[in-house]
Swiss-Prot record:
Keyword terms, alphabetized: Carbohydrate metabolism, Glycosidase, Hydrolase, Polysaccharide degradation, Secreted, Signal, Xylan degradation
Domain GH11 as annotated: residue spans: 37-225
MF terms in GO: endo-1,4-beta-xylanase activity
Summary of the function given for this chain in its UniProt record: Endo-1,4-beta-xylanase involved in the hydrolysis of xylan, a major structural heterogeneous polysaccharide found in plant biomass representing the second most abundant polysaccharide in the biosphere, after cellulose.
Annotated catalytic residues: E121, E212
Name of this chain's protein: Endo-1,4-beta-xylanase B
Organism: Aspergillus kawachii (strain NBRC 4308) (White koji mold)
InterPro entries: ConA-like_dom_sf, GH11/12, GH11_AS_1, GH11_AS_2, GH11_dom, Glyco_hydro_11
E.C. number: 3.2.1.8
């Protein structure tokens, strides 16, 4: 029995040693190249606009700042990311934008921002992929703005990433019924409608015209004015 066990161990060791060194190096190089293709999370100023890009590190996503208020994103089999250009701090401004947004799966194109005191994450969704992001929240009502009805929702995130680290906070959503990519978003209409429903914002932090992807693939190229 001892001899048989020794032979089995020897055979297993031989099989491991038989793996070509080159194949291990090739796999390592491939993983390194994949990580190089993904843009790391960052924030800052670019050509007169504030930008923010966040990713959980899953999949392949490339965010690129362009001229003035333009940016582009390409993503494949991502976990979750959100990025775009805008202002810091944000405000109740009219935001005019144009471009393309082509998600395959779950993705949103929205005016996206944060406030503090209270800590609120908000979305004014202009277009989305195969999942209505408001459907997981609590329906509150509607607001009509910029040629469409928007459905209003709230949701609570527990121990989730935020501008203040991991926290529990409320989300406000306005989701456009007639999807579009391009036009003017009158943010004050949404903020006022939310306030009438008891959904109060705090002190504005950043505000961007954002592309977000969740467990999906796609591309987006957006310009704000």
């Amino acid at each position: 029995m001892l001899t048989k066990n020794l032979l089995l161990c020897f055979a297993a060791a031989k099989a491991v040693l038989a793996v070509p060194h080159d194949s291990v190096v090739e796999r390592s190089d491939a993983l390194h190249k994949l990580s190089e293709r993904s843009t790391p999370s960052s924030t800052g100023e670019n050509n007169g606009y504030y930008y923010s890009f966040w990713t959980d590190g899953g999949g392949d996503v490339t965010y690129t700042n362009g001229n003035a208020g333009s940016y582009s994103v390409e993503w494949s089999n991502v976990g979750n990311f959100v990025g775009g250009k805008g202002w810091n701090p944000g405000s109740a401004k009219d935001i005019t934008y144009s471009g393309t947004f082509t998600p395959s799966g779950n993705g949103y194109l929205s005016v996206y921002g944060w406030t503090t005191d209270p800590l609120i994450e908000y979305y004014i969704v202009e277009s989305y992929g195969d999942y209505n992001p408001g459907s997981g929240g609590t329906y509150k009502g509607t607001v009509t703005s910029d040629g469409s009805v928007y459905d209003i929702y709230t949701a609570t995130r527990t121990n989730a990433p935020s501008i203040q680290g991991t926290a529990t906070f409320t989300q406000y959503w306005s989701v456009r019924q007639n999807k579009r990519v391009g036009g003017t978003v009158t943010t004050s209409n949404h903020f006022n409608a939310w306030a009438k429903l008891g959904m109060n914002l705090g002190t504005h932090n950043y505000q961007i015209l954002a592309t977000e992807g969740y467990q999906s693939s796609g591309s987006s190229s957006i310009t704000i004015q």
